[in-house]
Every structure is written in C-alpha cells, then in structure tokens.
C-alpha cells in the first residue's frame, strides 16, 4: 500500500506487513538433560539357584509342617489356661474335649492350675504332636492319655505322700518364748532385752529374724552380723548358731 506525500507521513517510516517475511520463532532450550532410556543397558539379575531334589523335599516338608500347625492350637492352649475346663475344643466335633476328659478321669484336677508340671507338659506335647502329625491321631486321645496319665498321676501322688511323711513339725517353744503373739504381748530382743519395734531410732526399731527362729532388734543384728565368729553366736540359751554368715539373718518388714 502506497501513501502520497500530501499526508505528511514519511514513507520510509511505514512498515509494509504484507511483504516482510515472518520473524524467526525463538525456541526455548531446556536446561535439563534428556536421558535416552533405550541406551541404558539392562541390569543383570542372578538366576535363582537350582535346588537339589533332597533340598526341595526338605522345603516342602517344612512348609507342610508349618501349614499343619495352625494358630488355633496355640489360642486353644491359651484359653484353656485362663478359662479352665469350660472351654471346648476347636477341633472337629468328633474329638473329645481335652480338659473334660481330664476332669472325668481325675476329679482332683478341676483346672489347669491344679495340674502338676509333668502332666501339663504332657498335654502341651500331645497338642503339638497332633498339630504336626494330624494323620497319625485319629481319635486316639483316650488311649494315649489312659496309657500315660496313670503313671504320671501315681508319681505325683507318691511325691505328695513322701513330703507329708518326711515333714516333722517343730517342738513346743521354750519357756519365755512364743510363736504366736498379739498387740498385748511384749516382745524383747535376746541381746539388749529391750522391747522390739518400739524405739524411735530407725535402725533399732527394725526387726531381724534368724534361721534358728529368734528375732533381734536392728542394732543388735548389725553387731552380730559384723562381729568375729566367736562373738556372733545367737545369745539364746542352748542355741549358739553363728549369725555372721551371709544368709543367717534377714530383715522383717511390718
């Protein structure tokens, strides 16, 4: 488009947009590097080792054993310990209740707490055996326990009888001594002959008993424990036990 000079416009200052070429488009160059993932070599992973047939059988047997040991046996044992014979077994209905069978066979055992350690361990071992080898235990609990409980029960009762027979009650106390007292009884220390437990001193008001069955105040007990052997004998007549050994005296708390 042309302009005449009468318009007062300088022709050299007019831009002809129809004939000028388009300005070049500036492309923005990213500052980040472009990574070609196809050019990166793949990591090499070692192949799994080939197990021998024996190792495969061992692994398969171990997996089967872990599957055959369900958690309900452990939870059943825990419930049995806390709840006693009221808990019913979680196995199939054809299996008899374990604690119920024990209670019927031995009425003395009303709960697990009354079982001896050997009988309790027998129950735990049986439950562990059933979990590991379920195919070997087809309702044979009665036969198993009937063969094992009688011997264990006899051992348990015989040990109680031996304890009862070997126990010898102590003889009557000597004159001036007692084994039962009340608030009105005045007890004195065999060494200082002062009342026990009435002193305002914290050390002297403490009570110390001896293996020979006598009670000293805290001050006299400290002297006897730290004295030489010849001077550490119990001062009760016809006693003479040495009281300076490690476990000859212990403090009583009241």
Swiss-Prot record:
Q: What segments bear the compositional bias annotation Polar residues? A: 1-10
Biological process annotations from GO: DNA repair; meiotic cell cycle; protein ubiquitination; stalled replication fork localization to nuclear periphery; ubiquitin-dependent protein catabolic process
PROSITE patterns per the UniProt record, alphabetical: ZF_RING_1, ZF_RING_2
Q: List the catalysed reactions.
A: S-ubiquitinyl-[E2 ubiquitin-conjugating enzyme]-L-cysteine + [acceptor protein]-L-lysine = [E2 ubiquitin-conjugating enzyme]-L-cysteine + N(6)-ubiquitinyl-[acceptor protein]-L-lysine
Pathway(s) this gene product operates in, as recorded in its UniProt entry: Protein modification; protein ubiquitination
Stored Gene3D superfamilies: Zinc/RING finger domain, C3HC4 (zinc finger) (3.30.40.10)
The RING-type zinc-finger regions cover 189-238
Q: Superkingdom of this entry's organism?
A: Eukaryota
Question: Keyword annotations for this protein?
Answer: Meiosis, Metal-binding, Nucleus, Transferase, Ubl conjugation pathway, Zinc, Zinc-finger
**Subcellular location field:** Nucleus
Give the signal peptide, or none.
none
Q: Give the matching InterPro entries.
A: E3_SLX5/Rfp1 (IPR038886), Ferritin-like_SF (IPR009078), Znf_RING (IPR001841), Znf_RING/FYVE/PHD (IPR013083), Znf_RING_CS (IPR017907)
Per the record, what is one GO cellular component?
Answer: nucleus
The segment annotated Disordered runs over 1-33, 45-69
EC number from the UniProt entry: 2.3.2.27
One annotated GO molecular function is: DNA binding
Membrane-crossing segments per the record: none
Return the Basic residues bias intervals.
53-64
EC class (word): transferase
Could you give the subunit structure recorded for this chain? Part of an E3 ubiquitin complex including rfp1, rfp2 and slx8. Interacts with slx8, chk1, nse5, pmt3 and rad60.
What role is this protein assigned? Answer: Mediates ubiquitination and subsequent desumoylation/degradation of sumoylated proteins and proteins containing SUMO-like domains. Involved in maintaining genome stability where it acts in the cellular response to DNA damage. Has a role in meiosis.
* The protein, known as: E3 ubiquitin-protein ligase complex slx8-rfp subunit rfp1
The organism encoding this protein is Schizosaccharomyces pombe (strain 972 / ATCC 24843) (Fission yeast)
């Amino acid at each position: 488009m042309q302009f005449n000079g009468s318009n007062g416009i300088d022709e050299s200052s007019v831009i002809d947009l129809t004939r000028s070429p388009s300005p070049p488009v500036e492309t923005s160059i990213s500052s980040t590097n472009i990574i070609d993932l196809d050019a990166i070599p793949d990591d090499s992973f070692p192949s799994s080792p080939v197990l021998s047939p024996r190792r495969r059988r061992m692994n398969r047997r171990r997996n089967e054993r872990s599957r055959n040991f369900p958690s309900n046996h452990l939870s059943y044992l825990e419930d049995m310990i806390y709840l006693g014979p009221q808990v019913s077994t979680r196995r199939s209905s054809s299996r008899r209740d374990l604690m119920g069978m024990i209670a019927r066979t031995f009425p003395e055992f009303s709960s697990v707490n009354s079982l001896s350690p050997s009988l309790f361990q027998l129950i735990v071992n049986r439950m562990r055996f059933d979990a590991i080898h379920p195919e070997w235990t087809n309702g044979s609990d009665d036969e198993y326990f009937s063969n094992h409980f009688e011997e264990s029960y006899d051992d348990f009762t015989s040990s109680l009888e031996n304890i009862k027979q070997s126990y010898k009650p102590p003889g009557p106390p000597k004159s001036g001594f007692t084994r039962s007292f009340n608030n009105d009884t005045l007890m004195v220390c065999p060494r200082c002959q002062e009342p026990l437990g009435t002193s305002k001193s914290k050390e002297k008001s403490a009570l110390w008993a001896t293996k020979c069955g006598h009670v000293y105040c805290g001050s006299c007990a400290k002297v006897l424990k730290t004295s030489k052997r010849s001077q550490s004998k119990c001062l009760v007549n016809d006693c003479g036990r040495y009281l300076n050994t490690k476990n000859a005296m212990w403090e009583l708390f009241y």
